[in-house]
Design a protein with these regions (language model features):
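Aromatic-lined carbohydrate-binding/catalytic grooves of carbohydrate-active enzymes
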Residues: 34-83, 110-120, 180-190, 194-233, ...
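Hydrophobic targeting/anchoring helices
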Residues: 46, 55, 180-183, 262-433, ...
């Protein structure tokens, strides 16, 4: 079988290239990479690159904050150069000679006229009101000019001119262009709030909040708190409708000139979190023709910057969820590789972790009714400047390891998701602080070594006899619930199941999390009854979703905490009813991912979650051939006394610290 096609994208500043070179440094850049990527998103950074576009009649220098992000001085290779509009147009032409797609991207932050008189200084009404950063920090793409013109109706026509004149192949909507920042702290500006008041009905907001407040960050903050606590659903719906309208216009404008669009998912890690906290319902974007969804799965850089917990499990499950709910977009995974401005470099400071995280992110699967497919259509290197030839070679090795095989079947079980559960989940979350659905398989993978890396939809769940894990069973429609309960193979339900109409012969774990909230883990089709109750000191106070949630990048959303004992008991119960794990020591910080291709070859990824070398005690049959597919270890591996080992097995086979080993296993027969 041919390998599933995958795309390789690079997001980079102009610092990756050389405007003084005859070909703008394109050949040297490609030679350094050692491959030709599918596409490059050219980070021109300043939104004024579009808003203050001067055309192509004359040559002129581009703003310093176009030539380098925020106008910073240099990267490892060169100082910021003085690019002109003609230079950049030439760069696009040179990249096209290699059949590379070239998209353009900008950010929303302003620099207070540091390098030029900015559009926002001429139109202060488009500033994004933010209770953390103040009013004069960024441009709001959902704003309105004082004459009533929507910002998007200025930006998109100018974007069309920029894309056509420079020869770009599309627009990459980066951070802040959908979704924006967290609804609990933006947009609190007069312009946006007054439009919301019209949408809501002016009489519903107290008169004090209909007064201008742009002069006072304290007044803006108080007004936003009131809206968040009293009109959260309406606030989120209004904001989402604005984003969907903007993206609908952008898609039409780009497609009309035979160009494409890519949308970022910064900050918002899942469908539900985006609906509730960021005011963008991705489900409404699925049908408007967006070509690419760039999932900002920056697990390595987040873990390095913020610590606390592993993010690879959450982000991996999120990618699977996004693929299932948004089937009409290509899903591109974005690992955070390095960034001069944000001051991190996973290639040099955490290469093992980067290798592991890219593999885990891109190798989530979706079952389509006949077989499993890789959920990711490709990956994007962020950012792609200042990388040495040796580092590019390592990135190519990671790609070959991660995309080098096709999946026919994946994991210990599948998990179920559907667009229909997110509306009732909003109400459930407000009442109980319910954990979003993608976090259930993530927690079980992280803490119980259950490989739940394949997702499916209700219409396909009867086409497999693999065990099926159903988080939030209680939120499905009666029709889908009936379909789930009628399955013949092992089915694992989680959620509030008191009145779910479950059969009597089930195995069940229960844990009371609140006065009127008991969480169940119920196993169907096991043949006998078993019940275990996990004691819990649940809080006396009801869950409160209203406090401002600020640390959306570094923390998970507020939720009712579930005792580890519940997941331990659930994991033990599930494992006792499925095949035993070949990994004998998950307690040593090791997890596994297993895949099967169409030739019956088993692919095994062993992932470390410790900062030291770890030995994975992994059972392999003696009558098989084992082939190492990861860069490390450097010597062959084989079976010694039934366990994976080095050929010279006097020394143990080490997993790299927070790294990965990938092997495939072929039966000799």
């Amino acid at each position: 079988m041919c390998k599933q096609a995958s795309e390789t994208w690079i997001w980079t500043e102009l610092l990756a290239f050389d405007c003084d070179s005859p070909d703008c440094g394109v050949k040297a850049y490609i030679d350094r990479m050692g491959f030709v990527p599918t596409g490059i998103s050219c980070l021109t950074s300043a939104v004024d690159f579009v808003l203050l576009y001067q055309g192509m009649d004359e040559e002129y220098e581009l703003f310093p904050d176009v030539c380098a992000r925020f106008g910073h001085n240099r990267n490892e290779e060169r100082e910021r150069q003085k690019w002109t509009n003609f230079d950049l147009r030439k760069l696009v032409k040179e990249l096209h000679k290699y059949n590379i797609k070239v998209f353009v991207s900008v950010f929303i932050l302003n620099l207070h006229n540091k390098y030029h008189e900015e559009f926002v200084s001429l139109h202060p009404e488009i500033r994004l009101g933010d209770k953390r950063y103040g009013l004069d920090n960024a441009v709001s793409f959902l704003s309105c000019l004082s004459d009533g013109t929507l910002f998007e109706d200025i930006f998109i026509p100018n974007l069309v001119k920029v894309v056509k004149d420079y020869g770009f192949d599309g627009w990459h909507g980066a951070d802040g262009t959908g979704p924006g920042w967290n609804l609990t702290h933006s947009d609190s500006s007069d312009g946006f709030v007054f439009r919301f008041a019209e949408y809501l009905g002016k009489e519903k907001l107290p008169a004090k909040y209909l007064q201008k407040a742009d002069h006072s960050e304290e007044a803006m903050s108080e007004r936003l708190d009131y809206i968040w606590r009293n009109f959260r659903n309406e606030w989120a719906k209004f904001t989402s409708d604005c984003w969907v309208r903007l993206w609908g216009k952008a898609v039409k404008a780009m497609h009309d000139i035979n160009c494409e669009v890519m949308i970022n998912s910064p900050f918002a890690k899942s469908i539900f979190e985006s609906i509730f906290y960021f005011g963008l319902d991705y489900r409404d974007l699925n049908d408007i023709g967006i070509d690419y969804l760039l999932t900002e799965s920056v697990t390595t850089s987040c873990s390095l910057n913020y610590g606390n917990y592993e993010r690879v499990f959450d982000f991996s499950a999120m990618i699977a969820e996004m693929r299932a709910i948004l089937p009409k977009m290509k899903v591109i995974v974005m690992p955070g590789v390095k960034d001069v401005v944000e001051s991190y470099d996973a290639l040099r400071h955490a290469p093992c972790r980067l290798e592991r995280d890219i593999f885990a992110n891109v190798n989530q699967s979706i079952f389509d009714g006949s077989r499993a497919h890789r959920a990711a259509d490709g990956h994007l290197i962020c950012l792609g400047d200042g990388i040495s030839p040796e580092e590019w070679h390592h990135l190519s090795e990671i790609k070959e390891m991660s995309f080098g095989f096709d999946t026919e079947k994946a994991g210990d079980m599948m998990w179920l998701i559907s667009p229909e559960i997110f509306d009732p989940l909003v109400r459930e979350y407000e009442s109980f602080g319910t954990m979003p659905p993608y976090q259930f398989p993530a927690v079980l993978a992280e803490t119980q070594n259950l490989d739940i890396s394949c997702v499916t939809l209700p219409q396909n769940m009867d086409k497999t006899d693999q065990p099926l894990f159903v988080p939030m069973f209680n939120l499905y429609s009666d029709e889908v619930k009936k379909q789930i309960l009628n399955r013949r193979s092992l089915t694992i339900l989680m959620g509030r199941l008191e009145d779910a109409g479950l059969p009597e012969n089930i195995k069940c774990i229960k844990c009371r999390l609140a006065k009127d909230y008991t969480l169940f883990c119920a196993l169907l089709n096991t043949g006998d009854y078993e019940e275990k109750i996990i004691p819990s000191d649940f809080p006396a106070e009801k869950f409160d979703w209203r406090p401002t949630y600020l640390k959306f990048i570094s923390t998970r959303i507020p939720r009712t905490e579930i005792p580890a004992e519940f997941f331990n008991a659930a994991g033990e119960l599930i494992r006792s009813n499925i095949s035993p794990s070949p990994l004998l020591n998950p307690q040593d910080g090791v997890t596994q991912m297993r895949f099967y291709d169409s030739d019956g070859v088993e692919w095994v990824a062993l992932l470390s979650h410790r900062d030291t070398y770890t030995v994975a005690r992994y059972q392999v049959p003696a009558d098989c051939r084992i082939e190492k597919k990861s860069p490390f270890p450097y010597s062959p591996v084989y079976s010694a006394d039934g366990l994976l080992a080095l050929a010279e097995h006097r020394s143990p086979l080490h997993l790299p610290p927070r790294g990965i080993i990938l092997i495939n296993i072929r039966k000799n027969s």
